[in-house]
């Protein structure tokens, strides 16, 4: 998913004519490089199958791109309503063919909480995309590594290695520089 902001930046520059400076694009690439460094991939695993991990970020980038393209001046509630209805119809077909009863009633509460958090996060994403340039908003997705590192350490006890520390520092530094570079009101079109 970490390549999605780069894909979105390219799509929005070509089709939406979003303004993104060369310095901003370089900072996005450097943030992406920080992610790659922190994950520490091995060069021994290069194979044609590596194209498959590009499909999810491409789908996520297309979701954000089409959300920006379609939502326009619509109410974010309308956008999330149509997204939810489409998802409910598509996945109801799948679930009806593969239904397994839920074992514990407490799982229903977790499903409801998951739905509420998904609604809130998608509503905020749609609202942010409507207010600003798409390439500006999507760069904040790089903070996922910071939060996942903290959660993995605090909740699951996964140790933090040196690569992750350097990667998190890089993401934070390049993110702050990106906000300073691309966050001026002249470049980011904020609606009043």
Language-model segments: residues:
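Hydrophobic alpha-helical transmembrane segments of multi-pass membrane transport proteins
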Residues: 37, 54-66, 94-136, 173, ...
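Transmembrane alpha-helical segments that form core, pore/gating elements
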Residues: 42-99, 190-192
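Membrane-interface capping segments at transmembrane-helix boundaries
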Residues: 131, 179-191
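C-terminal transmembrane-helix exit sites in multi-pass transporters
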Residues: 4-26, 146-165
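Small-residue-rich packing faces within the transmembrane alpha-helices of Major Facilitator Superfamily
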Residues: 32, 88-89, 146-147, 172
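Hydrophobic transmembrane alpha-helices of multi-pass small-molecule transport proteins
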Residues: 23-40, 163-182
């Amino acid at each position: 998913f970490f390549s999605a902001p780069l894909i979105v930046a390219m799509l929005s520059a070509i089709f939406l004519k979003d303004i993104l400076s060369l310095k901003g694009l370089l900072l996005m690439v450097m943030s992406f490089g920080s992610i790659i460094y922190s994950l520490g991939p091995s060069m021994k695993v290069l194979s044609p199958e590596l194209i498959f991990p590009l499909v999810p970020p491409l789908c996520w980038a297309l979701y954000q791109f089409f959300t920006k393209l379609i939502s326009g001046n619509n109410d974010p509630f309308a956008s999330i309503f149509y997204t939810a209805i489409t998802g409910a119809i598509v996945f109801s077909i799948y679930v009806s063919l593969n239904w397994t009863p839920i074992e514990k009633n407490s799982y229903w509460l977790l499903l409801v909480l998951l739905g509420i958090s998904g609604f809130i996060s998608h509503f905020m994403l749609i609202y942010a995309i409507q207010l600003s340039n798409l390439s500006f908003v999507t760069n904040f997705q790089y903070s996922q590594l910071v939060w996942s590192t903290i959660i993995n350490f605090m909740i699951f006890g996964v140790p933090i290695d040196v690569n992750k520390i350097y990667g998190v520092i890089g993401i934070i530094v390049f993110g702050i520089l990106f906000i300073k570079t691309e966050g001026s009101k002249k470049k980011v079109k904020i609606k009043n």
